[in-house]
Amino acid sequence: VELLRDAISRETAYGQGLVPAYAESLRQVFLDAGFPPEALTIVPYGETASLVLRYEGDGSSGRRPILFSSHMDVVPADPESWLRHPFELQEDETFFYGRGVLDNKFDVTLLTTLFVWLKESGFVPNRDLVIAFTGDEESFQETVQQLARDYRDLVDAEYALVVDGGGGVLNDANEAIQFQ
C-alpha cells in the first residue's frame, strides 16, 4: 500500500513535469530489490519520461521477451471538484480513492510489486521480461512512439501485454459482455 500511496501523491498530469521524478523513484525500488543498474533505463522526453526495466531470463525458452506496458501519468484533477483530495491515497473498508487508483497507478504499482517479488524470490524467467512505463498516455502518447522508434532494442518483444485501467459492461446475470 505504501508504494501506491507514494504513487498517488505524485501529481503526474501533463505539464506538471513530475513524471521523471516518479520514474526515478520506481527505478530506486527496482534497484533496492536487486535489479542491476544496467537493467534500468530512464528515457527523457520533454517534461516527461519513460522507464524501461529488463528482467533478464536464462534464455532457455529460445524466445523473444514479453513486454509489459503501462503508464505513469494521470489526467489532471482539480482538488476543489473532488470529495476527497485526489493526490492523497484514502481508503475505506472497500475501496481505495485517489487520482490514478484506477488509471493507472494501481497497475504500475502492481507490476512493480510483482517484479520485485519475483526478483527477491530468486525467480529466473526462461526469457527476458520487459516493463515499459511511459509518461504521456493521457495526452499525446509520444513516449510510446519514442520507445518504438528510437529505443526499439529496449522494448522489442515477441508480444506485449498492456496493463492499463479500463472497464466493462455486465449483463443482468453479471456476465461480462464488453471490455474497454
Question: Would you name each region that the model predicts?
Answer:
Residues 1-99, 120-127:
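Acidic/His- and Gly-rich active-site-bordering loop/insert found
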Residues 95, 102-180:
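Acidic/histidine-rich catalytic neighborhood of metal-dependent amide-processing enzymes
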